Amino acid sequence: EGFAELRIPIVKDRPFFYDLTANGAVRVSDYSTVGTTVTYQAGLVWAPVADFRLRGTYAQAVRAPNIGELFAPSNQTFAFIDDPCAFDSRDNGSDTREANCLSLLQGLGLTDAQIAGFTGDTGTSLPGLSTGNIDLTEETAKTLTFGAIFQPTFIPGLILSADYYDVEIEDAVATPSANTLLELCVDAVSLDNEFCANIDRTPVGGGFDPADAGVVSGFTLQPKNVAAFSTKGIDFSARYRVPTEKLGIFNFSFVGNHLISLETQGTPGADIIENAGVLGDPEWQVNFDFNWTLDNFNLNYGINYADKTLRFSRADIAADPDIVAPEYLKVDSRFEHDVQLRWTTDSNMSFYVGVNNVFDQEPDVGLYFDPVSALGRFFYAGIRISGDDLGF
């Protein structure tokens, strides 16, 4: 692995150009599994005045598949098959599905009459294999960010910032289900694809029952570079530090995120799913912390907020508008308060007590971790002793 970084001051101390600086970096990595990868980033920072600056960055990053995704041993698994080549399913996919199914079944020796009435029904849970995939390649992420920082000299200790981000991940690693493999196989342009290679079918004369001709006899589930993700949002923060002569130091911190979109596509051609605002991915999250230090004492009070989220995916709600009573459609917002008091001795030994979830907010109906943990209000106390305190 090797890398290089570059910083180029372009203009400085000029009207409307207090600072203009370009920066860039490149990294080349050679993996024994996926070979050579290249990542890079380029950015620009412009400060028209000393108190205010704009910044932007474009970057490409990669993630090499991990050891489990590559080399997981084979294990048996089971699945119920819904064959896309059944006579009543051939027109429910891509424009090439019907032609591919005909070619596939003819290649197995089925007659026109058998193909016309083919159901693909195995009548039972079908055994298959789950294993790693040594042919995986790296995931690639492309990121665009731009934002602003305001640090006014007339209000010492105040820092305001906001950054917009746009991230797209291609060739993401995911493991298609058995039924998804079947659909991807025949919905592709041709049958010469990696998905068909993971499906076994019984040729004419190859089974104990003539009715098994053409039926799926086995499958192999493997991680593949088939998924895609994208997200957009805004990170924002405000920090204010107020030192005083007699009352100690006050620190205020306000950090948040607005999730504009979070789209996932599990496999090529699959529906794009919007997850922003769905359980686990709130559109708004904010953390506020107040910290006060006076001599050896420190007090911290924190508030963690997340807005309401849908209990079910938008696709599930669209398919069944009455999936749940209206009052349970959304999970309550999180408004958790935490407090801690710490005393540190002159020898750096510290004692602390605190309460998490001060007002004992509970999880929503039917949930254990949303919007808060089922643990409820939590009291704790402790002591921290370093080796120096013990004389070694």
Residue ranges and their predicted role:
Residues 11-20, 51, 92-97, 153-159, ...:
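Short loop/turn motifs that connect adjacent beta-strands in outer-membrane beta-barrel proteins
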Residues 68-160, 219-234, 281-283:
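Outer-membrane beta-barrel signature, preferentially recognizing the C-terminal barrel domain
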Residues 159-315:
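Gram-negative outer-membrane beta-barrel transporters
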